[in-house]
Curated annotation (Swiss-Prot):
The winged helix domain is involved in binding to DNA in the preinitiation complex. It comes from the Archaea. SMART domains: TFIIE (SM00531). It comes from Cenarchaeum symbiosum (strain A). SUPFAM superfamilies: Winged helix' DNA-binding domain. Transcription factor that plays a role in the activation of archaeal genes transcribed by RNA polymerase. Facilitates transcription initiation by enhancing TATA-box recognition by TATA-box-binding protein (Tbp), and transcription factor B (Tfb) and RNA polymerase recruitment. Not absolutely required for transcription in vitro, but particularly important in cases where Tbp or Tfb function is not optimal. It dynamically alters the nucleic acid-binding properties of RNA polymerases by stabilizing the initiation complex and destabilizing elongation complexes. The gene is tfe. The keyword Cell wall biogenesis/degradation does not apply. This is Transcription factor E. Belongs to the TFE family. Monomer. Interaction with RNA polymerase subunits RpoF and RpoE is necessary for Tfe stimulatory transcription activity. Able to interact with Tbp and RNA polymerase in the absence of DNA promoter. Interacts both with the preinitiation and elongation complexes.
């Protein structure tokens, strides 16, 4: 369980992956330059789960790993450390990705006319699809009518504006 006063690194880790990520993130903050075996023993998680979490966080640039030779075993091991300074840029990048996807969807909604039969179980169809089906629903056979998508366009536009405003305030 986390609270709103928890370290942002831990909060982001939980959002990405849940309880396993929470345990690994807390362990990384407690012990700088920890190996995956040390993290596994401190969290009680299996080593393969710890490695999965570490590789995912590493792929998102939220942690860094340094390869060193273990003097006792002679093997190379990774020592992991959190990159707390990267949390803000990670959040900013995620917001930009979401905003881009929303903008693509808004552009699609703006550039297309949609048709629907009125049955909740059936999907709406673009004009081209309706024309191919002779304006008959391919699922139920009812006549397809023009369906307004103003609500969807307004919702996408509003969310895009919220994210833009948030990005301007934060950065």
């Amino acid at each position: 369980m986390i609270d709103k006063y928890e370290d942002p690194f831990i909060r982001i880790a939980v959002m990405i992956g849940g309880d396993e990520y929470l345990k690994v993130a807390r362990s990384l903050l407690k012990a700088e330059d920890a190996t995956d075996e040390e993290i596994a023993s401190s969290t009680g998680l299996r080593i393969n789960m710890v490695r999965k979490v570490l590789y995912d966080l590493f792929g998102k640039s939220l942690i860094s790993g340094v390869r060193v030779k273990d003097e006792r075993k002679g093997w190379f091991v990774y020592r992991w450390r959190s990159r707390r300074e990267e949390v803000e840029s990670f959040i900013e990048n995620q917001k930009k990705k979401i905003m881009g996807r929303l903008q693509q969807r808004l552009d699609y909604e703006n550039s297309s006319e949609f048709y629907h039969c009125g049955n909740d179980d059936c999907q709406r169809i673009t004009f081209e699809g309706a024309l191919e089906e002779m304006f008959k629903c391919p699922s139920c056979g009812k006549v397809l009518n023009l369906k307004k998508n103003d609500k969807a366009k307004k919702a996408f536009g509003k969310k895009i504006d919220e994210i833009k405003k948030d990005l301007q305030q934060t950065f």
